[in-house]
Amino acid sequence: MDDENGLELSLGLSLGGTSGKSKARDAPLEPKAEPQVEESSSKGVSQTPEAPFVHYYQTNAENQEHSSKQRHSPAAPPFGNFWGQPGSSSVPVADGSNEQKPVSSKRKLLSEEISFQKKPNTAAEQPDAFSKSSDGGVKNAPISISTDDGSTGENEDVAESEAEGSNSWLVAQREDSAKGSVVNRGSDRKRSSDDAAVGFQGKRQPSFSGSESSSGKLPQGNPLSLQASNVVAVPYQVPSQVSAPPSITNASNFTPVCTVQLRPPTNNGLAVTMGSTSQVAFGYPAVQLPTLETSSSWAFGAPPQAMSSFTAKDKVERAGISQADDGKKTQEAGASSSALVEDDKKSDRALPLMGSAIRPGIAPNVKFGGSGSYPDLPWVSTTGTGPNGRTISGVTYKFGRNEVKIVCACHGTHMTPEEFMRHASADAPGQENSATLPAFPVGNQAASAQN
């Protein structure tokens, strides 16, 4: 359509041939349109970017002639050429010579700012960018119209209409992006389900994310129909078909992370072997694995079948130490008893030298003072000769290698066997009346005998 001056008012329709030709021809004249063309072509978007139109209308005669030539130019190219050449530039630029420069930022209309600020990110992520609208028509960028004479009343109306068109274009593009995201999500879910079908066969493993996995669900009748025959660490709870280890009974609120050995299924079922030898899968024999104590508060009541090697070693060492202690005690007891026997033998050896006057044992009429008698000591007794002779008793002990002395029980005097016999003879009353020898000593005769 033309105004009163005969100029063509081109609204940037993609099907218009005259404006398309002039725009394609004068595209290098606009320095600001080049980075936008490269950006749109790199993103694969067939939409026309919002480039500032500078001095679209020229009032000189030369531009009028040029516009008249454009009116008589051939029709628009066919749709096949338009859609088949995605690399061809469809950027609308202004006609004119190289002397025309872009206007200042005051001339930029509201549609350009809205399109640059509120452009959705989904248009840059998806390669097709939904170049068609919902009704099949091609979306066009808004056009800024400015004149040299400064008449902006008409341009303001155009700017308002273009702003409304840009807003509707943004809404339509968001709806298309939402539809595309739903389609892509469905395709991704289908692709992940296909990956999960071949995941346990060694090709690919499914990725579990979130509370619900996006991969395909396994059938309930056959929970894990696996073909791999290797050891798999299961980070989740094992199904009820898998038997628990025999050393631990089933307890509530206890989900152990166990190692299950998976084998090929038999008769369309799951063949999972987990018995008493399942602990060997960790790389250690069953004897070296520590077990739970039944006496603790958190035990499961079952007696442990596998004993720790450290516990067994400690028990063996303790048994050896106890046996060694018992051996030492028996040896000490045997040594002490043998020492007593040897002392008895030595005393017996010394006694025959003294004759039959000194005999082993204690006299029945001996009176003890202090702590009483000690029958376990090597007691000997003798009876003195003469009118003043009496029976006395004493304790023998080894004084030297071949000498034995006797401590009398009446006075606690250490003497030789000969002196012990004379002490029981006639000189006994004189010693009893003597002040140096008390009749009944209060001291311990056993202690004096050991000293």
Swiss-Prot record:
<comment type="similarity">
    <text>Belongs to the Ninja family.</text>
</comment>
<keyword id="KW-0539">Nucleus</keyword>
<feature type="region of interest" description="Disordered">
    <location>
        <begin position="427"/>
        <end position="451"/>
    </location>
</feature>
<feature type="compositionally biased region" description="Low complexity">
    <location>
        <begin position="207"/>
        <end position="216"/>
    </location>
</feature>
<dbReference type="InterPro" id="IPR031307">
    <property type="entry name" value="Ninja_fam"/>
</dbReference>
<comment type="subunit">
    <text>Interacts with TIFY10C/JAZ8. Interacts with TIFY11A/JAZ9.</text>
</comment>
<feature type="compositionally biased region" description="Polar residues">
    <location>
        <begin position="86"/>
        <end position="103"/>
    </location>
</feature>
<feature type="compositionally biased region" description="Basic and acidic residues">
    <location>
        <begin position="23"/>
        <end position="35"/>
    </location>
</feature>
<feature type="region of interest" description="Disordered">
    <location>
        <begin position="321"/>
        <end position="346"/>
    </location>
</feature>
<dbReference type="GO" id="GO:0005634">
    <property type="term" value="C:nucleus"/>
</dbReference>
<dbReference type="InterPro" id="IPR012463">
    <property type="entry name" value="Ninja_motif"/>
</dbReference>
<dbReference type="Pfam" id="PF07897">
    <property type="entry name" value="EAR"/>
</dbReference>
<feature type="compositionally biased region" description="Polar residues">
    <location>
        <begin position="143"/>
        <end position="153"/>
    </location>
</feature>
<dbReference type="GO" id="GO:0045892">
    <property type="term" value="P:negative regulation of DNA-templated transcription"/>
</dbReference>
<feature type="compositionally biased region" description="Acidic residues">
    <location>
        <begin position="154"/>
        <end position="163"/>
    </location>
</feature>
<feature type="compositionally biased region" description="Polar residues">
    <location>
        <begin position="38"/>
        <end position="49"/>
    </location>
</feature>
<protein>
    <recommendedName>
        <fullName>Protein NINJA homolog 1</fullName>
    </recommendedName>
</protein>
<feature type="region of interest" description="Disordered">
    <location>
        <begin position="1"/>
        <end position="223"/>
    </location>
</feature>
<dbReference type="GO" id="GO:0009867">
    <property type="term" value="P:jasmonic acid mediated signaling pathway"/>
</dbReference>
